[in-house]
């Protein structure tokens, strides 16, 4: 307990900075994942062939060890936040892509035909019919991806990306439990807070009649 108090007194200000840094790395990667995965998921629903291959490839990338992905980008991008964010971006794509694809494919075809009947263009059907109906599943994928990345972002310190992982690695290398706790506990709290915020957001953007839908696993 004394060691933990000493750690907090010594590193209190830096701990807040590291927490913000950790959140920044995670959220930038998730935002990039959303920008890529949602349009790609919609596009795949328009493909008669190839959708399974694309999702299968992303699945393979997801199974690669996190440290291997981080190490892969060192020769290409060096060390620091950029390679860490790029590596985390790759991990963010699968849950969002899979849920977007599944959510859009699950939209009732009769509704799409009705949209065509009143003169909707393809883009209008996506924007006004398909995305709103698929939003519970899409948001569930975003939520899953974000929580995963907050945990995986601890590995960013392996390549100089910063964040709360710095404390965990220092604690492991120097056998100082207070540093491990000082990094791990804020990560856990951060994940819980972000999960709650995203859960509230999910309820706000989901039409009331669709709020019973669950994430596709």
UniProtKB/Swiss-Prot annotation:
Keyword Transcription attributed: no
Induction info: Repressed by OpcR.
Membrane topology summary: Multi-pass membrane protein
Keyword DNA damage on entry: no
A Pfam cross-reference name: BPD_transp_1
UniProt-listed CDD domains: TM_PBP2 (cd06261)
GO cellular component: plasma membrane
Main localization of the protein described in the UniProt heading: membrane
Protein's recorded name: Glycine betaine/carnitine/choline transport system permease protein OpuCB
Parts of the chain that traverse the membrane: 23-43, 52-74, 84-101, 128-148, 150-170, 180-200
Function: Involved in a high affinity multicomponent binding-protein-dependent transport system for glycine betaine, carnitine and choline; probably responsible for the translocation of the substrate across the membrane.
Family indicated by similarity: Belongs to the binding-protein-dependent transport system permease family. CysTW subfamily.
Keywords, alphabetical: Amino-acid transport, Cell membrane, Membrane, Transmembrane, Transmembrane helix, Transport
Every ABC transmembrane type-1 domain range: 19-198
Assembly, per entry: The complex is composed of two ATP-binding proteins (OpuCA), two transmembrane proteins (OpuCB and OpuCD) and a solute-binding protein (OpuCC).
